[in-house]
Curated annotation (Swiss-Prot):
Entry keyword annotation includes Signal: yes
Protein name: Apolipoprotein E
Name of the gene this protein is made from: APOE
Keywords: Chylomicron, Endosome, Extracellular matrix, Glycoprotein, HDL, Heparin-binding, Lipid transport, Lipid-binding, Oxidation, Phosphoprotein, Repeat, Secreted, Signal, Transport, VLDL
Pfam family, one: Apolipoprotein
Subunit structure: Homotetramer. May interact with ABCA1; functionally associated with ABCA1 in the biogenesis of HDLs. May interact with APP/A4 amyloid-beta peptide; the interaction is extremely stable in vitro but its physiological significance is unclear. May interact with MAPT. May interact with MAP2. In the cerebrospinal fluid, interacts with secreted SORL1. Interacts with PMEL; this allows the loading of PMEL luminal fragment on ILVs to induce fibril nucleation.
Region of interest (Homooligomerization), ranges: 278-329
Sequence repeats: from-to residues: 92-113, 114-135, 136-157, 158-179, 180-201, 202-223, 224-245, 246-267
GO molecular function: cholesterol transfer activity; heparin binding; phosphatidylcholine-sterol O-acyltransferase activator activity; phospholipid binding
Region (Specificity for association with VLDL): 290-302
Species assigned in the record: Arctocephalus gazella
Free-text function comment from the UniProt entry: APOE is an apolipoprotein, a protein associating with lipid particles, that mainly functions in lipoprotein-mediated lipid transport between organs via the plasma and interstitial fluids. APOE is a core component of plasma lipoproteins and is involved in their production, conversion and clearance. Apolipoproteins are amphipathic molecules that interact both with lipids of the lipoprotein particle core and the aqueous environment of the plasma.
Length: 329
């Protein structure tokens, strides 16, 4: 991983470093015989290649558009330059751009976990240098506007065509420098972001490669532990089931034996009761005969007395004799 980041930093240093080119004396001192109107009316060439996507790029695009409007040197621009409004607006846009660049850098640096600290410090230093160059260019624009404002105020009532021509030329150069350093910073941040993404992907891949065998081992070990833990439990359950089954069978056999004993005892009791009943019946028959012998004479005597009584009653009332009651046997 360290070798990868080292190669990435070398490529960044070799391919993206761009020093600010000093302006030539010829560009600093334009010949006064240049045609002022031609310089003022020359259209600003479009900046192909600049693509705004990140917040800092959008902020820089607003700075760029405002600077292009200032370069037109229209009457409104002249009024706002003299009132210091242009300088204030450029300062606001510049600070906003620097703030967005700083926030974007901080966001990328938070994602640099896999990068070595030495490599991270080197890359951060290069980004800081590119950011400083862009800030210097933007401050040069603001300084040049302040100088132009002072020169215009000093030449009130005089022709400022030559002054405006020089200012327009300087603004074109400054805009080119801003564009060049902005593109340089954009490339460095793109390489920085690509390195962060690649490092994160490699880290995830490395973690997956390292963790997958460990996960497989853990899964296999867990399966073995489950098997070992389940086997004794199953054997224990089977043993308990057999013990319970044996006890139930033993209790059932005991219950059946007890029922058989109870049944035998009941049969014995029943037999004894029948025997006793027969004995009592046999013993009662002589007693019954004896009682019958005792009461039959009394009954016959009572029947005779009843018949005599009835005859007397009939004779007294003069009715036919009534048949005496007959004992039903």
């Amino acid at each position: 991983m360290k070798v990868l980041w080292a190669a990435l930093v070398v490529a960044l240093l070799a391919g993206c470093w761009a020093d600010v080119e000093p302006e030539s004396p010829l560009e600093e001192n334009l010949e006064p015989e240049l045609e002022p109107k031609r310089e003022l009316e020359q259209e600003v060439e479009p900046e192909a290649g600049w693509q705004a996507g990140q917040p800092w790029e959008l902020a820089l695009a607003r700075f760029w558009d405002y600077l292009r409007w200032v370069q037109t040197l229209s009457d409104q621009v002249q009024e706002e330059v003299l009132s210091n409004q242009v300088t204030q607006e450029l300062t606001t846009l510049m600070e906003e751009t620097m703030k967005e660049i700083k926030a974007y850098r901080a966001e990328l640096e938070e994602q640099l976990g896999p990068m070595a600290s030495e490599t991270q410090a080197r890359v951060a230093k290069e980004l800081q240098a590119a950011q400083a160059r862009l800030r210097s260019d933007m401050e040069d624009v603001r300084t040049r506007l302040s100088q132009y404002r002072g020169e215009v105020q000093a030449m009130l009532g005089q022709s400022t065509e030559e002054l405006r021509a020089r200012f327009a030329s300087h603004m074109r150069k400054l805009r080119k420098r801003v564009l060049r350093d902005a593109e340089d910073l954009q490339k460095r941040l793109a390489v920085y972001r690509a390195g962060v993404r690649e490092g994160a992907e490699r880290s995830v891949s490395t973690i997956r490669e390292r963790l997958w065998p460990l996960l497989e081992q853990a899964r296999t070990r867990h399966a073995k532990v489950d098997a070992l833990a389940t086997q004794p439990l199953r054997e224990r359950v089977n043993a308990l089931g057999q013990q319970l089954r044996g006890r139930l069978e033993e209790m059932g056999s005991r219950a059946r034996s007890h029922l058989d004993e109870v049944r035998e005892q009941m049969e014995e009791v029943q037999a004894k009761m029948e025997e006793q009943a027969n004995q009592m019946r046999q013993q009662a028959e002589p007693f019954q005969a004896r009682l019958k012998g005792w009461f039959e004479p009394l009954v016959e005597d009572m029947q005779r007395q009843w018949a005599v009584l009835v005859e007397k009653v009939q004779a007294a009332v003069g009715t036919s004799p009534t048949t005496p009651p007959v004992e039903t046997k």
